[in-house]
């Protein structure tokens, strides 16, 4: 019974697409001739995606199967809706002059850098070898390392003279380390 209702629903959805002929709204390229220059046909599409979403017994197809036939074949059902495509025969060619494209481009094109711009120029070879007159033995300054030594302070409280509180605070001193390495 479910399959019968499914077939009836599919037929009810596809009959308007199969019976009705959609007229192409494309304007002719020549303004002198009002009649159509080319024999144009429109391609009809089959709404399978709607039926699959309505009836979960078909299951959801997660993969789009691409058919190995031309897209303009009107006898093969397609899973999605698409705009009708006009098919033109190659025998009839319009004898009209093409209008120039007046609209400016919307995207600004950037120039590509040439390989000569990217290439690094070769180094010039010098005839003489110049020895620098700089002292190569550098003096090493000893690093300064701070060390912390704890100092003990005693504080006497006037109220409790028998108790002493000791606190330790670190004091920082700097010690210079000298090395004889060169």
Curated annotation (Swiss-Prot):
Glycans are attached at residues 154, 161, 178. The keyword Transit peptide does not apply. The modification Phosphoserine is found at residues 161, 179. Keywords: Glycoprotein, Milk protein, Phosphoprotein, Secreted, Signal. One of its GO terms (biological process) is lactation. Transmembrane segments: none annotated. It comes from the Eukaryota. Mammary gland specific. Secreted in milk. It is found in: Secreted. This is Kappa-casein. It comes from Camelus dromedarius (Dromedary).
């Amino acid at each position: 019974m479910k399959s019968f209702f499914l077939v009836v629903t599919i037929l009810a959805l596809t009959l308007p697409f199969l019976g009705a002929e959609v007229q192409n709204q494309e304007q002719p390229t020549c303004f002198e001739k009002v009649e159509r220059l080319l024999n144009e046909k429109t391609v009809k599409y089959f709404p399978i995606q709607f039926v699959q979403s309505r009836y979960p017994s078909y299951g959801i197809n997660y993969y789009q199967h691409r058919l190995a036939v031309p897209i303009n074949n009107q006898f093969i059902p397609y899973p999605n809706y698409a705009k009708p495509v006009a098919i033109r025969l190659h025998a009839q060619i319009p004898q009209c002059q093409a209008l120039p494209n007046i609209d400016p481009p919307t995207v600004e094109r950037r120039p590509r850098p040439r390989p000569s711009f990217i290439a690094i120029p070769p180094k010039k070879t010098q005839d003489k070898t110049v020895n620098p007159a700089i002292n190569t033995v550098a003096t090493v300054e000893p690093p300064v390392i701070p060390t912390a030594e704890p100092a003990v302070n005693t504080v006497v409280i006037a109220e409790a003279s028998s108790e002493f509180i000791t606190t330790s605070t670190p004091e920082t001193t700097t010690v210079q380390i000298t090395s004889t390495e060169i």
